[in-house]
């Protein structure tokens, strides 16, 4: 398990493609993070579910990314799921950190690595994030990287056996590129 970072110290994060040989490490990290994830996300917690997740990544309708620290340890996951092509070119953004990596800016770094890929390599036009209204940290995260609140979808996602309301946050490729351009000029 990682050593908590303090203040401005943030462990550098990089993206890594999930692979079959990661199953044991993922299942251990998920088990250690149950309390952290309870009621918010449902990551794969069995070998069968992990295999299914990998298969989805391979079918083109889903992009999965591991966030790994400088020691190669799993810090979190960023998924682009339910990819719709044609006139939409959109996907849903999902993410979570593992226990020991929360509140360190890890996910902010991770999303700043994934979004250029989403709007470049994956040729997406729009990303949407569904966030439970009480998840203040997640709301701040997406707002700080340029997502805009579009409304609330009532009882829209079933997590932990319960239907839960979710705020709908979104960003388009143009909005992302505009923010990136302004950051470079600053």
Give names to the regions the model predicted:
Residues 44-48, 58, 96-97:
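Juxtamembrane/interface motifs at transmembrane-helix termini
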Residues 1-34, 68-186:
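Acyl-donor (CoA/ACP) binding surface of acyl/acetyltransferases
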Residues 35-53:
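Conserved GNAT-fold acetyl-CoA-binding loop/helix
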Residues 55-66:
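A short helix-loop-beta-strand connector motif used in the catalytic cores of GNAT acetyltransferases and
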């Amino acid at each position: 398990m990682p050593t908590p970072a303090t203040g401005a110290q943030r462990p550098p994060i990089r993206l890594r493609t999930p692979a079959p040989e990661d199953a044991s490490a993922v299942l251990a990290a998920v088990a250690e993070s149950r309390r952290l994830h309870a009621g918010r996300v449902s990551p794969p917690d069995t070998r069968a579910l992990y295999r299914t997740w990998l298969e989805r990544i391979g079918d083109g309708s889903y992009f999965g990314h591991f966030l790994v620290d400088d020691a190669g340890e799993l810090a979190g996951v960023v998924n682009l799921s339910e990819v719709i092509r044609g006139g939409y070119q959109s996907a849903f953004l999902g993410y979570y950190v593992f226990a020991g990596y929360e509140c360190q800016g890890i996910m902010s770094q991770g999303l700043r690595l994934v979004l250029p890929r989403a709007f470049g390599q994956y040729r997406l036009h729009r990303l949407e994030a569904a966030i439970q209204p009480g998840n203040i940290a997640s709301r701040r995260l997406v707002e700080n990287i340029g997502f805009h609140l579009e409304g609330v979808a009532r009882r829209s996602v079933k997590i932990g056996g319960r239907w839960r309301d979710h705020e709908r946050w979104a960003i388009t490729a143009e909005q992302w590129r505009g923010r990136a351009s302004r950051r470079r000029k600053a």
